[in-house]
């Protein structure tokens, strides 16, 4: 194999590996996001939204000092799909039951395929005009943990 063919071979494999594994690496360590409105704070962190996952999971916490947190997240949360036209409802919730001032749990969804460039989770609370929106760009190099190594 001559030098040019060796370089082509190497470049093809590097590009192929980046295409195959790049999105998984970026989706592995997405930041927690929070939203405060009406005295209720909602914090969401993706746990697993990788390309190989059949189920996507999000760690969700709700906190307030002023009201009862009776939200049924399986009925009020959804992911907006690629076309933005259909809402994907949760597959389940494992965590604290409705009620009280602090709730934590894992909200799960059937994974979207193919993996979108971004994920948008919305939670519509009773009495609030608009849903809370949490969005993560999966194809952004800013999500690569290697970019933030200290």
Report residues per predicted region.
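Bacterial N-terminal signal peptides that target proteins for export
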Residues: 2-14
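Hydrophobic core
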Residues: 15-20
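N-terminal signal peptide c-region/cleavage motif recognized by signal peptidases
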Residues: 22-24
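Beta-rich carbohydrate-recognition modules and glycan-binding surfaces
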Residues: 26-29, 47-50, 94, 125, ...
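N-terminal secretory signal peptides
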Residues: 27-77, 147
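Long, contiguous binding/interaction regions
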Residues: 48, 52, 65-86, 122, ...
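Short, solvent-exposed, Trp/other aromatic-anchored flexible loops in extracytoplasmic proteins
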Residues: 84-135
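Short beta-strand elements
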Residues: 135-150
């Amino acid at each position: 194999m001559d030098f040019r063919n060796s370089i082509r071979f190497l470049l093809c494999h590097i590009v192929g590996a980046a295409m195959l594994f790049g999105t998984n690496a970026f989706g592995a360590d997405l930041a927690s996001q929070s939203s405060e409105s009406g005295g209720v704070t909602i914090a969401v962190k993706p746990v697993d939204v990788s390309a190989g996952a059949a189920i996507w999971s999000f760690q969700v916490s709700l906190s307030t000092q002023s009201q009862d947190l009776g939200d049924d997240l399986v009925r009020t949360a959804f992911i907006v799909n690629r076309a933005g036209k259909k809402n994907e409802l949760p597959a389940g919730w494992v965590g604290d039951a409705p009620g009280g001032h602090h709730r934590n749990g894992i909200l799960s969804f059937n994974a979207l395929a193919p993996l979108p460039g971004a994920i948008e989770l919305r939670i519509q609370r009773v009495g609030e005009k608009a849903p809370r929106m949490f969005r993560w760009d999966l194809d952004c190099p800013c999500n690569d943990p290697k970019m933030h190594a200290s």
